Amino acid sequence: MRLSRYFLPILRETPKEAEIVSHRLMLRAGMIRQEAAGIYAWLPLGLRVLNKVCDVIRAEQDRAGAVEILMPTIQAADLWRESGRYEAYGKEMLRLKDRHERELLYGPTAEEVVTEIFRASARSYKDLPKNLYQISWKFRDEVRPRFGTMRSREFLMKDGYSFDLDQAAARHSYNKVFVSYLRTFETLGLRAIPMRADTGPIGGDLSHEFIILAKTGESEVFCDRAYLDMPVPPPSVDFDDVAGLQGVVDSWTSHYAATDEMHDEAVFAEVPEASRLSARGIEVGHIFYFGTKYSTPMKAVVTGPDGQERPVHMGSYGIGPSRLVAATIEASHDEAGIIWPDAIAPFDVALINLKVGDAACDAACAEIQSALETAGLSVLYDDRDERPGAKFATADLIGLPWQVIVGPKGLAEGKIELKRRASGERETLDPVDLPARIRRV
């Protein structure tokens, strides 16, 4: 993609309304634009990142045996009355009426809808287990939306829901998602620490938040430093191995880890002083087991092996892709701009032509772009008639993993320059060696 043809509305000045790094950089890098309080348009660069985050989430959910669906954003109020949550949810929920005066709502979550879908089709224990998920837009009318997409009113959410015959089977479904989330965050280049959490309006008696550490985190967290180096299960992990998965979950919950809401100072004091870590954290995922909280009032039942009807046991599991984009920036940036992990970078390579219009530079850049794209790498080619300093600033701001710098001086010696954005390391090499060099990392 040529930058001269791309829509990248970069801001030269830091927006006054941006309070945290991710909000500031997302606005400056032309990733998003605010349309109303807590509501954002996703522009091309930001949308590429958002889609890549969703791709990673889908891959890990599919690996764990979950099945993707898509439920309506506008939901019937009657379903929420069945579960008892319509009046309890409060002003966060946007309520509306259609032309026939039927009460509807803009779904902040989808436990009721997915339960209705399940009860209409499942009849027997032989229909279990099931894990259904979607990636769709949600709306919660926050009192004070702030921090850009970190705490917005409209947001993209991956929400999943499991259905099992009993508590033991439901716990295995919970463990599957627990492990798949560890893998998801690892693939995204984030170290997420699972912490016991309050179940809030979702309900239930078992819940974990997945927290990444960041100086601008929204809450204070306390944990054992052991979590910083714990191994994450590999892609080959067997999600059908009940004991094996339980062992992984046990190891990842055996050390102290708590948000400020759940923190117990006396228990934390038992952790060796050198291992205690107090920091700021950002929630990037939340999982719940809530048993029959929804299935009982909504009559989502199946016939068991004994021929008796019983309500199914359920869990729900959320990751916010739009929030994850901001959280990744909070965890990975420097003074010059964003530093994207390879897995979700909008493009792999920033190709910088230092002298547009020079026949040798133009020809070399065309050949390099073709070679990189043939090798399966995505390229954003800066072919603008701008001074080199402006091009370097743009490349650092948008944070693509690699910068390939092509200029007359280097080409005279048959060389180009390669810069790794994360480390700042530079090297010169022959253009023909470039694809293999990048692929080697």
Swiss-Prot record:
Subcellular location: Cytoplasm
Transport among keywords: no
Key words of the record: Aminoacyl-tRNA synthetase, ATP-binding, Cytoplasm, Ligase, Nucleotide-binding, Protein biosynthesis
Catalysed reactions, semicolon-separated: tRNA(Pro) + L-proline + ATP = L-prolyl-tRNA(Pro) + AMP + diphosphate
CDD domains according to UniProt: ProRS_anticodon_short, ProRS_core_prok
InterPro entries from the UniProt entry: aa-tRNA-synt_IIb, aa-tRNA-synth_II, aa-tRNA-synth_II/BPL/LPL, Anticodon-bd, Anticodon-bd_dom_sf, Pro-tRNA-ligase_IIa, Pro-tRNA-synth_IIa_bac-type, Pro-tRNA_synthetase
E.C. code: 6.1.1.15
GO biological process terms on file: prolyl-tRNA aminoacylation
UniProt-listed PROSITE patterns: AA_TRNA_LIGASE_II
The keyword Cytoplasm belongs to this UniProt entry's keyword annotation: yes
GO MF annotation terms: ATP binding; proline-tRNA ligase activity
Sequence intervals crossing the membrane: none
Pfam families reported for this sequence: HGTP_anticodon, tRNA-synt_2b
Family of the protein in this entry: Belongs to the class-II aminoacyl-tRNA synthetase family. ProS type 2 subfamily.
Subunit structure: Homodimer.
Protein name: Proline--tRNA ligase
Organism name: Methylorubrum populi (strain ATCC BAA-705 / NCIMB 13946 / BJ001)
